[in-house]
Amino acid sequence: KLPAGKVEGTYFYETDLPEYPEGIPVHAEIDVDPANGKIRIDLTRNVDNVPLGINMTESTTLASCRMATLNVLGSEIPRCSGAFRCIEVTMREGAVIGKPKMPAATCAATSNLCSAFASHLHALYAKLQPGLGSAYGTVGVPASASVISGRAPRYGDKDYVNQILMGYWGGPATGKSDGWLTCGSASTQGAISQSSVEVSELQHPIIVEKLSIRQDSSGAGQFQGSPGATISFYANKASVRFIFYSGSREIPPRGVRGG
């Protein structure tokens, strides 16, 4: 399915940590060995754990590698332990991408850095051969997909906490097609259902003033990356806490192969 070859590269995840003024480096090396039926991914050159909750875990690291590889191989390859054994991942303990070492925090191990890392793997496969992989996509959880909490006056001031997913968009272009609008990030792959504006307003004390496709936000190229979202919403006669952790404001998602 894949040509023999080796690709490697570094992407940067933006951060306010003073140790990484250019961003946290995300590095991976991929070695495709069709003769032996193996794909080897080396992550040992990634930096040590950082004092943030974005450190990845062994499980999210393995899942990202398997997901990106199986996406490139296609749907006819079964998603099973036999296929997983053909993808050999080398990581180290105490790395920001790999096995965390106490007291490293991993509360956001499935989003921010995970999104950047999974996108990076897809982009590396795009370097291997035309028609493979994808460009970089959404990183983190934008304000349009906030976790909201508070008390709901409509329901007897009961406490609530929930995540609403409105405008979790910006799917990257692939080697064969335009980006899928509701893809979300590389770590969700379009598998998360989008929240209804009307239902969200009924369930929570919020008003959604605007939700629209952001103008001129697509990625240009042979195939086009899908656009992002513009959203405006606010609390409705109640105190509401909105929490989100977006990324890529300073380091936007990149194209591949000249896109």
What are these regions (language model features)?
Residues K1-G259:
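Glycine/proline-enriched, intrinsically flexible loops and inter-domain linkers
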